Amino acid sequence: MSNRRAHRIGLGLAALGRPAYLTGGRNHDLGDARSVEDMRTLTATVLDAAYAGGIRYVDAARSYGRAEEFLANWLNSRSDITDIEVASKWGYRYVGDWRMDSEVHEVKEHTLKAFTAQLRETRALLGERLDLYQVHSMTEDSPVLSDAQLQHALGELRDEGVGVGLSTSGPRQPEVIRAALALEVNGAPLFSSVQSTWNLLETSSGAALSEARDAGVSVVIKEVFANGRLAPGTTDASPGVRKALRLAAELQIPLDQLAIAAALQQPWKPRVLSGAVTTAQVHSHLAGTDIELPPHVAEELAGQSEEPVEYWAARSQREWS
């Protein structure tokens, strides 16, 4: 059964393409079944559930371990499926060597050389199925904002018919969004899509994302569950999480559905990424698309965000598991 607003949910593969990630609850969700074949099979199972539920947008990245490979395997095995929008990202490399205890899991490089190499790698796996290629986690110091040759190369990809987007992370997301959306190549905007972190605890990107929507740019939000802080089973005791838990209990819905419903009710109409790693999570996230939060709940939630610097500092301390 498809949910009413399933088309506004996308499936992100950050937590499926590699054995370790910084989202909480992975030991409960995955146990020890983390081999390449375990995760390949699980990815296909979750993709099947997402597609059956009406999800038509899938988001991968070069740094998400073998996510592009797993997605390509699934697409090749489902030749009947032609209506999936496929997005991926370049700018980080996965260096975790499929280990849970790797000291470093990914390395950032926003250079022309990295773009050229990673686009070649992505196309080797996804071929013509690639619809959107995003700069991964742009910050104010990203060379993308100043390197004319790199901008020109991205513009060439845009002119070939592949959408060019960016994702943002960190406490200065609004400034990065505005700077990126001001970029033009050959007289046309470079970016047609922006993906940013937005959730009940980190809302600072909201105004800039609203401006992006007004400019005709597609808006996608990630980490709507704050890497597990706003998911069922959370052990987070911060004021914002406690308030969200109380309101979810009042509405008799799970915390993840509250988080999704709040995101979907933003006036700039984002697409919301689910980071589901189980079919049960897919079903719960889709159920969240049918929930309309009462005005008093939306008002109470609006005042619970943390200072961006504090939010991102806490996120940087999360352990990969």
Features from the language model and the residues they span:
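N-terminal binding-site loop/beta-alpha segment at the start of enzyme catalytic domains
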Residues: 1-85, 89
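Short, well-ordered coil/turn segments that N-cap beta-strands
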Residues: 5-9, 54-57, 80-84, 127-131, ...
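Short acidic/His/Gly/Ser-rich catalytic and metal-binding motifs that mark active-site loops
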Residues: 17-23, 94-99, 229-231
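Active-site mouth loops of central-metabolism enzymes
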Residues: 21-41, 100-116, 142
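Short, acidic/polar
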Residues: 35-49, 108-125, 172-184
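Structural motif corresponding to the early beta-alpha repeats
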Residues: 81-112
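Active-site groove signature of glycoside hydrolases
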Residues: 121-143
